[in-house]
Each structure stands twice: as structure tokens, then as C-alpha cells.
């Protein structure tokens, strides 16, 4: 019986490490997909390519959670932390960085025992005062961290244009 051996460069000539089987790219609040647990199958076809993980839309993309926004009048971060109680969360400002940390110890759920921990850091834009940043936790588990953006210094004004009779650029004398 012959066994076909497919070299990874032949199967994926342009992206040999494009979509490895891995568990470390999860979002902390998301569940595993069944395809995350199995290696890419070469038994189906030598030309089978596992769909890359960035093409699969995670569930938070539909809800708009875990995002950072910079709007005209404010800066905000929305983060899905439904698996954590307010006592298990910390929000700190360190210089120009917001640090969000969540941790809960091992506890039992319907599937067994679970513990979770995450750290997220967000750079504060230059026009946001770090002392004015606030945070709140909604009833559905969305942590919102926001701060007002500084307004421009003074009202807008129009500057009149005057016309001059002399040219701005003069020709250099030829040697």
C-alpha cells in the first residue's frame, strides 16, 4: 500500500504557516470551535486548505463588543467581561495607557472546573485627559471605559487673505 506524503510547501506554496492548528489565539471569553481541536486534514485531498482563522467571524463581531472607538467628542473602550464579577476586575491608568485586568479563581461550571484571567492595554490618545477617564459595567457584562476628548483651544476663525504686488519667488541671478 502506497502512502502519499505531501510536503507542506507544496500544499501551501505561498503561506506554509498560514493556518496552523492552535489554541493560543482564542479570545478570553469565547468558546472553542470543533475545528480548533483537530489538525488540518491531509487525508481529504492534497489540496485541502483549512480556512484561516481570520476568515471565521468570532461571535463578538456581530455585537460590536471588545472594541476601541475614537469619536469626535470622546474616546471609549467596550469590552465583553460577562464571565467576571465587578470584584474580579481592575481598571488602571498608568501614564498614557489604560490597563484592564480580570481574574477569577478556579470554580465549577456545567462542564467541569474553569478559571479565567486576562490583561488588556489600550493607549490613551494625546487629546484625552487621563484624569477624566471613567469606567462602568453594564448589567449584560460590558465594561465601558471612556474619557472626553479635549476641545480645540478657542473658537474657529477665518483668516483673511491679502494680495501683494511683489512676487514671492524671485529668480536667482545667472552666472
Swiss-Prot record:
Residues 56-164 form the sHSP domain. PROSITE patterns: SHSP. Keywords: Acetylation, Chaperone, Cytoplasm, Eye lens protein, Glycation, Glycoprotein, Lysosome, Metal-binding, Methylation, Nucleus, Phosphoprotein, Secreted, Zinc. Belongs to the small heat shock protein (HSP20) family. Zn(2+) 1 binds at residues 83, 111, 119. Lens as well as other tissues. Residues 144-175 are annotated as: Disordered. GO terms for cellular component: cytoplasm; extracellular region; lysosome; nucleus; protein-containing complex. This is Alpha-crystallin B chain. It comes from Bos taurus. The record marks 72, 82, 103, 121, 150, 166, 174-175 as: Not glycated. Heteromer composed of three CRYAA and one CRYAB subunits. Aggregates with homologous proteins, including the small heat shock protein HSPB1, to form large heteromeric complexes. Inter-subunit bridging via zinc ions enhances stability, which is crucial as there is no protein turn over in the lens. Interacts with HSPBAP1 and TTN/titin. Interacts with TMEM109; in the cellular response to DNA damage. Interacts with DES; binds rapidly during early stages of DES filament assembly and a reduced binding seen in the later stages.
Amino acid at each position: 500500500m502506497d502512502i502519499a506524503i505531501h510536503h507542506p510547501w507544496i500544499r501551501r506554496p505561498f503561506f506554509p504557516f498560514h493556518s496552523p492548528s492552535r489554541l493560543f489565539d482564542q479570545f478570553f471569553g469565547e468558546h472553542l470551535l470543533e475545528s480548533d481541536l483537530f489538525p488540518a486534514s491531509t487525508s481529504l485531498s492534497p489540496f485541502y486548505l483549512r480556512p484561516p482563522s481570520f476568515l471565521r467571524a468570532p461571535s463578538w463581531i456581530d455585537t460590536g463588543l471588545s472594541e476601541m472607538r475614537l469619536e469626535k467628542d470622546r474616546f471609549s473602550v467596550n469590552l465583553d467581561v460577562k464571565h467576571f464579577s465587578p470584584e474580579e476586575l481592575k481598571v488602571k491608568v498608568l501614564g498614557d495607557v489604560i490597563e484592564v485586568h480580570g481574574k477569577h479563581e478556579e470554580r465549577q461550571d456545567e462542564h467541569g472546573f474553569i478559571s479565567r484571567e486576562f490583561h488588556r492595554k489600550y493607549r490613551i490618545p494625546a487629546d484625552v485627559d487621563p484624569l477624566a477617564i471613567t469606567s462602568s459595567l453594564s448589567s449584560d457584562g460590558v465594561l465601558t471605559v471612556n474619557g472626553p476628548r479635549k476641545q480645540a483651544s478657542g473658537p474657529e476663525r477665518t483668516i483673511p487673505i491679502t494680495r501683494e504686488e511683489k512676487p514671492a519667488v524671485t529668480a536667482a541671478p545667472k552666472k
